A protein has these predicted regions:
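Ribonuclease/tRNase effector modules and their secretory precursors
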Residues: 1-143
């Protein structure tokens, strides 16, 4: 990670904290918040039941540029294409709970329409029995 990316991540993390400081957070929201703010080395594990009664298990990586927290902060949080707010990020689990799913060999893509916006959450499927599903991205249809 270069210095410019580090500076952007620091600025966006501060903006994220400022945006959510007055919200009452659920336990789930707090876990997402902690992943985005504290970014410990160990990934955060999530287990969510979707509307089809499938239990979806995945990790949210906090230290990789190409997926998870850093990808969302750099590419989609208050950004250009696919813009999402801190509030929407805190509630990304609702996209799995309430959204439609499309599964291919590599990914589960959940799509959920709310307030005229379309949100997508992509979970990369594990490659082996010992592997782990990884949250790749979360974004909207905002341009």
């Amino acid at each position: 990670m270069n210095q410019k990316q580090k500076d952007i991540i620091k600025r966006k993390t501060n903006e994220f904290c400022e945006e959510v400081k007055c919200l009452n957070l659920t336990e789930e929201n707090k876990r997402v918040y902690n992943a985005f703010v504290y970014r410990r080395a160990k990934p955060y594990k999530f287990e969510i039941v979707d509307k089809y009664n499938n239990t979806i298990r995945f990790v949210l990586c906090t230290n990789k540029l190409d997926d998870g927290v850093l990808h969302i902060l750099l590419k989609h949080y208050q950004g250009g294409v696919g813009k999402v707010s801190a509030y929407e990020i805190l509630n990304f689990c609702d996209v799995i709970r309430k959204g439609e799913v499309n599964v291919n060999d590599n990914n589960m893509i959940y799509t959920y329409k709310q307030n005229g916006r379309i949100f997508k959450l992509i979970v990369a499927l594990k490659r082996s029995n010992t592997g782990t599903n990884i949250l790749k991205s979360f974004y909207s249809d905002r341009k």
